Structures are given as structure tokens and as C-alpha cells.
């Protein structure tokens, strides 16, 4: 009886009133009921039949699983029960829900103005059956037209989150961007309609339209009764939730120790201690702040990169993090802070201002905007309506090379960019991209003309003159072959001389890059097996400029692909998880042309392309030809799914074979083994 009452209550969460010309759907056994009595009978009979027929898999029962199977369904104008969407972390539960609804008896349809119409319901099936529900799905009824269900519509699903264990899940905060976690998210985004996946990181509030994040995490919870056990294995370290505000505090670590095959150091290590504070004030404003205190000693080839990329007032650039101060015995000290404010005034706009990273694209790499460089100050506007998502991004960047400093200060430069994502239909997405890089000319800061969010920057750059900036345009696309397979691409154009493009001369000024890739979710019908393949090619001198400060880079690192330009690269990735256990494997092969004998062959975006080797005969991998192979294998265990604290171990094989060895880059064969404990909330890139 309790099970009946609970599901009846949730079915009736929104009361629907029908006029005399309207009738509610009539379920078997309710033929003699009318008006409100008919509605109550429908809810009671339907609930009873669903509970009687629903069988929870024995494995979940044995594991004391608790969760919700949220079902969105239609009672069609033909009287059939048509399941539109099932949201659950387990395919077995989804299959069971679809089977139960598929076997329900035919009902008499609802009517409006005397004609049959579709009516939509939302029902949470609580596991164990009859347990007290925490979230409730609110039904939405369309009476004047047939319903086309789009899981992205925010009003379709409303979760009650007061005193939730995960207040961030319904906030306007960013989901931390790591390739491993986003491989899981993208599967659910791709299953839905009208989803946009190229602009990252995603907002939690957007993700909840496609996936029940709370259920995914609670499914991994350990049965702990002590407060310490819950904090270690399941929950936020500290959390406060009130009616008008909330915040969480979590300590974070990245503690690693390892060994490579060099004789220069006894062992490698990373020692990061950090704290993250996140919260919300009211319904529309959220904040996040993270501070990292880090020391590390890396494999030889990473140390060579750090020291080769000098920084004013420091020893070098730690990849993806920033300024590194040298320590004894080859280590580096590299503190960093990241923070942002996120404000969402309505369902169309989100505004963010902060210090961090962004990513535009659907691949492992990106030629539009990647997260390989250090964090930067930025202001972002995200606009979403109809089938459009429009992203504006303004970035404050630094050229930290000592040789370009003025009065011991690093020159400032700016990037204004926008990206338009358009869902052409249910399968095809097309994106348009434009960015312009300018310098701090006459110390006047960001040119006000570039704050126009809808202007074409290339035209502004043209009117300001050839020295006014460096513009880049691009096109990306994604095609959903099935719910499990997607193909994606990017094309970036830095400069083009049309008359020289097809003449076969290899003209240097035709600077472009492109990407082709595919993703396969639940590959070969193996749950949670993810496969990805990707090809990246960049012409020499792409992303560079005659004035090096106007290159597409920040803090000695590219804003696009980690390898800069003048290369081709192929990447193959496999990921698998089972409960809290996970494994990742990645193979990278490629060829790149490096500079030699003081000549600029087009691989270093920080060199002026005025010093190019020639105007014609420019080919990919020209210069000091280098073959690169990198194999990376990692396995681990998620200690806390709420904070993504992980224990892991991994091994990296790297073969770097140059035609000619130089003083800065030498031929190396590296085997690097690491184990550690880390809070996995950002990407490390050592595949260069």
C-alpha cells in the first residue's frame, strides 16, 4: 500500500484540470470513473501494475542499490504507452522499465475539445521499490498539440534539491573538465536531442537535462555509517546548505612518485596540496575558488621542456600550469590559483568571469581552443536558444619570454573569440569559429571594438590595418551516426592566398590545420568501453605571425594544439570502467619538423614568420624531421566519487627520434612509471 501511495503522490505532483470537453486517459478498470475520480483511478491502477511487473536485477538487490529510474512517457492519442526517455545509471534498469511500459494494456486516450491528444507524464520508480523518493519529476502536459520530446528542455525535468548531497548538480558551476570524465558525459549528451558538446566545460545545470549525476555517484557509494567514513569514501569534506545559499569545502591533492629510465635523478615526484571552495548565493549566482601549492620533479623530457621555455623571473614553464621556480635536485615550485563567478539571469544566458581554462571542440586535441596552456583571466558569455549555442570569450594573456619583457614586465595581449554551435538536425551539428589576437598597443588595453559580441572580428582587424591584430577563423562539425558512434572534425584557417592554394607551389602563406575523429561509446556492446581515434594535421607557420606577440599562444604554450604547427599526429584512446575501477590507454604517433641551424621551419609559433626559410616549397614536417611515439597506460580506483579522488598507477613509453640532435632537443627513449593519489579535476598533457 505504501508503494502505491508514494507513486500516486509523484504522479499527482502537478494537478491537471480538464474542462467538460476534456477527458483524462482511461486505464483498464476505470471505465465508470469521471473527472477527478478518473484521474485518481488512472494513477492508482497504473502505479499498481508497474510495481507488480517491475523486477529489479538480483545483482543490484545484492549490492543494496538505492536510486531512481526516471521515466518520461506518453499516453498517445491511440492509447499506447510510449516511453520517450529513461534516465538511470544502469542499462538493465532502463531495459526493464521499457519492457514494463511496453507490456501495459492499451488505455483510452485523453481528449481535448473532443479529439484524442497525446499527454506526457513523468514517473520516478524508486529502488528499492516503495522507498521514500528524494527527487521528484514534475509532469508536463501538452493539450493543444502533439508532443515532440526534447530531453534538453529544462522545464521538462525539475529536481527538488533542498538539502541535497550534491548542491552543485543544480548550480551554474562548471563540471571540471577532464577527458576521462567527459567521455562519460558525452555519451548521455549524444543520446539526447538538441545538445551542444563543443564548448567546454559544461555547466552542471545543462548536464542534468541529460543525465542524473546524483544517481551515477550514489550508485558508487560505500555503505559507511561513521562520519569519517562517509567523508572519505562518499561525500564532500565540508558542506553547508541554507535556504538562500550553500557552499562546500574540499581539500585536494596530487601526490605522485615515479621513476624514469634516466640516470640524472633517483625518482620523480609531484606534491600538490590544494583546497577548493564552491558555493551559491541565491538561485542565480555561483562561485568557485581553488588554490594549489605544488612542487614537482618530472621525467627528463618534461624537465627539458620546462627549462627551454624560459619565464621572466623564473626557471621555466611547467606544462599547463605556469611559472616554475627551480628547486634543488632538478625540481620546480609552481603555485597556482583558479577562480570564477558564474551568473545565470535566465534560461538563455550565462555570464562567467574568472581565471581558468576553456576548450572548444569535440576531440582530444583542438585547433580552436585547447586547455594545454596555463590558466588565464577571461570573461565568457554563453547564450542558448532554439537550436543555437553561442559562446563569446574574451581572454587576457601574457607573453612571458624574458627577451620581450619591457622594464621587467611581460607584455600583455588579448584574444576575443566567438563560437556558434548550430544543431542542423537531430544528427548534424555545425560550428563557426572566429578569434582575433591583439596586443596592448600604447597601453590602452582591450580595444573596445572587440567587445561587440556579434561583430565579425576579421572585418575589425582589417579596418585597423595589417598590424592591428591576427585573426583566425574555423569550422567544426559533429555527426551522430548512432547513439553510440559520432564523427567530428575541425578546420582552422590562419591565412589563405586563394590564387596560390591550388597551384601546387607549397606557398608558405596558406596556413591551416584540420582534424578528423570518431568516438565509439559502449563499443562492441561492452558497457562503459569507450574508443576514440583522431588525426590532426597543421601546416608550417600556422598560428604564428610576423610579430611574434600576435601568435596564438599564452605563457610559452600554444592555445591550440600542444605540438604547435608543422606536424601530423594520430591518437588512439581506449577507456573502460567497472564500478569504482577504471583503466585508460592512449597511443600517439606522429611526425614533426623542428627548427635547426638557426632557421625557422615553421614548427615554433613563437618565432616571427618573417624569418621563414622560403616562400614556396613549404611542406609538413620540413626541417629537423622527428618521429614521435608515445604509449600511455593507466589504471586506478576512485576513492571518492563526489570529489573524484583517485588512486592510480601508470606507465608511459616515449620514443623521440630526431634526424639531427640539437642542444635543446635530443633523441630520447623514455620509460616513466608513476603511482599516486590525486583529485582528478584537470588534464595533464605530457604527450609531446
For each feature predicted by the language model, list its residue ranges.
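Charge-biased low-complexity segments
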Residues: 5-6, 17-148
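Short N-terminal segments immediately surrounding and downstream of signal-peptide cleavage
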Residues: 21-36, 153-171
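Residue-level preference for beta-strand/loop junctions
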Residues: 65-67, 117-119, 269, 333, ...
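A mature extracytoplasmic/lumenal domain signature
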Residues: 73, 85-88, 123, 129, ...
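Outer-membrane beta-barrel channel domains
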Residues: 155-429, 436, 440, 503-512, ...
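Exposed, low-structure sequence patches enriched in small/polar residues
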Residues: 334, 428-688
Amino acid at each position: 500500500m505504501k508503494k502505491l501511495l508514494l507513486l500516486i503522490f509523484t504522479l499527482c505532483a502537478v494537478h491537471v484540470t480538464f474542462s467538460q470537453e476534456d477527458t483524462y486517459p482511461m486505464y483498464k478498470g476505470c471505465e465508470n470513473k469521471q473527472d477527478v475520480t478518473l484521474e485518481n483511478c488512472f494513477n492508482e491502477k497504473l502505479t499498481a501494475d508497474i510495481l507488480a511487473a517491475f523486477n529489479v536485477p538480483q545483482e543490484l538487490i545484492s549490492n543494496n542499490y538505492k536510486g531512481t529510474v526516471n521515466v518520461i512517457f506518453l499516453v498517445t492519442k491511440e492509447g499506447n504507452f510510449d516511453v520517450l526517455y529513461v534516465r538511470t545509471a544502469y542499462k538493465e534498469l532502463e531495459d526493464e522499465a521499457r519492457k514494463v511500459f511496453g507490456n501495459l494494456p492499451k488505455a483510452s486516450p485523453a481528449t481535448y475539445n473532443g479529439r484524442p491528444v497525446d499527454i506526457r507524464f513523468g514517473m520516478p520508480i524508486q529502488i528499492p521499490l516503495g522507498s521514500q523518493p528524494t527527487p521528484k519529476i514534475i509532469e508536463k502536459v501538452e493539450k493543444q498539440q502533439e508532443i515532440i520530446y526534447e530531453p534538453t528542455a529544462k522545464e521538462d525535468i525539475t529536481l527538488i534539491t533542498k538539502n541535497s548531497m550534491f548542491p552543485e548538480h543544480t548550480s551554474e558551476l562548471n563540471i571540471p573538465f577532464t577527458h576521462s570524465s567527459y567521455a562519460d558525459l558525452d555519451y548521455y549528451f549524444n543520446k539526447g536531442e538538441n545538445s551542444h558538446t563543443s564548448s567546454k566545460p559544461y555547466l552542471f545545470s545543462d548536464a542534468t537535462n541529460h543525465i542524473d549525476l546524483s544517481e551515477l555517484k550514489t550508485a558508487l557509494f560505500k555503505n559507511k555509517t561513521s562520519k569519517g567514513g562517509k567523508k572519505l569514501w562518499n561525500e564532500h569534506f565540508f558542506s553547508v546548505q541554507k535556504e538562500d545559499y550553500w557552499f562546500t569545502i574540499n581539500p585536494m591533492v596530487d601526490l605522485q612518485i615515479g621513476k624514469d629510465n634516466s640516470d640524472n635523478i633517483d625518482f620523480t615526484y609531484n606534491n600538490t596540496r590544494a583546497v577548493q571552495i564552491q558555493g551559491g548565493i541565491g538561485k542565480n549566482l555561483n562561485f568557485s575558488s581553488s588554490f594549489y601549492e605544488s612542487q614537482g620533479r618530472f621525467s627528463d623530457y618534461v624537465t627539458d621542456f620546462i627549462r627551454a621555455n624560459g619565464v621572466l623571473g623564473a626557471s621555466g614553464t611547467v606544462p599547463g600550469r605556469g611559472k616554475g621556480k627551480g628547486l634543488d635536485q632538478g625540481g620546480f615550485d609552481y603555485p597556482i590559483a583558479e577562480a570564477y563567478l558564474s551568473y545565470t539571469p535566465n534560461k538563455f544566458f550565462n555570464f562567467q568571469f574568472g581565471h581558468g581554462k576553456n576548450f572548444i571542440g569535440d576531440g582530444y586535441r583542438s585547433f580552436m581552443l585547447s586547455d594545454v596552456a596555463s590558466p588565464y583571466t577571461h570573461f565568457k558569455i554563453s547564450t542558448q536558444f532554439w537550436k543555437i549555442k553561442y559562446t563569446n570569450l574574451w581572454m587576457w594573456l601574457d607573453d612571458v619570454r624574458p627577451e620581450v619583457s619591457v622594464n621587467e614586465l611581460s607584455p600583455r595581449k588579448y584574444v576575443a573569440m566567438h563560437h556558434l554551435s548550430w544543431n542542423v538536425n537531430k544528427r548534424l551539428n555545425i560550428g563557426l569559429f572566429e578569434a582575433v589576437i591583439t596586443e596592448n598597443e600604447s597601453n590602452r588595453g582591450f580595444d573596445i571594438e572587440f567587445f561587440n559580441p556579434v561583430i565579425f572580428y576579421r572585418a575589425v582587424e582589417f579596418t585597423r590595418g595589417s598590424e592591428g591584430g591576427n585573426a583566425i577563423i574555423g569550422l567544426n562539425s559533429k555527426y551522430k551516426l548512432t547513439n553510440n558512434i559520432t564523427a567530428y572534425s575541425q578546420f582552422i584557417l590562419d591565412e589563405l592566398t586563394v590564387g596560390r592554394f591550388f597551384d601546387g607551389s607549397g606557398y608558405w602563406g596558406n596556413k591551416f590545420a584540420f582534424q578528423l575523429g570518431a568516438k565509439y561509446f559502449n563499443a562492441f556492446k561492452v558497457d562503459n568501453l569507450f574508443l576514440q581515434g583522431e588525426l590532426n594535421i597543421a601546416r608550417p607557420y600556422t598560428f604564428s605571425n610576423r610579430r611574434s606577440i600576435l601568435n596564438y599562444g599564452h605563457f610559452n604554450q600554444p592555445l591550440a594544439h600542444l605540438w604547435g604547427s608543422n606536424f601530423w599526429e594520430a591518437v588512439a584512446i581506449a577507456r573502460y570502467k567497472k564500478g569504482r575501477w577504471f583503466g585508460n590507454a592512449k597511443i600517439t604517433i606522429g611526425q614533426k619538423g623542428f627548427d635547426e641551424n638557426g632557421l625557422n621551419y615553421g614548427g615554433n609559433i613563437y618565432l616571427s614568420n618573417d624569418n621563414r626559410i622560403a616562400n614556396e616549397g613549404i611542406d609538413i614536417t620540413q626541417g629537423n624531421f622527428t618521429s614521435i611515439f608515445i604509449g600511455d597506460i593507466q589504471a586506478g580506483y576512485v576513492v571518492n566519487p563526489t570529489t573524484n579522488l583517485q588512486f592510480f598507477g601508470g606507465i608511459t613509453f616515449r620514443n623521440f627520434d630526431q634526424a639531427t640532435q640539437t642542444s635543446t632537443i635530443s633523441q630520447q627513449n623514455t620509460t616513466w612509471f608513476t603511482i599516486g593519489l590525486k583529485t582528478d579535476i584537470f588534464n595533464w598533457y605530457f604527450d609531446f
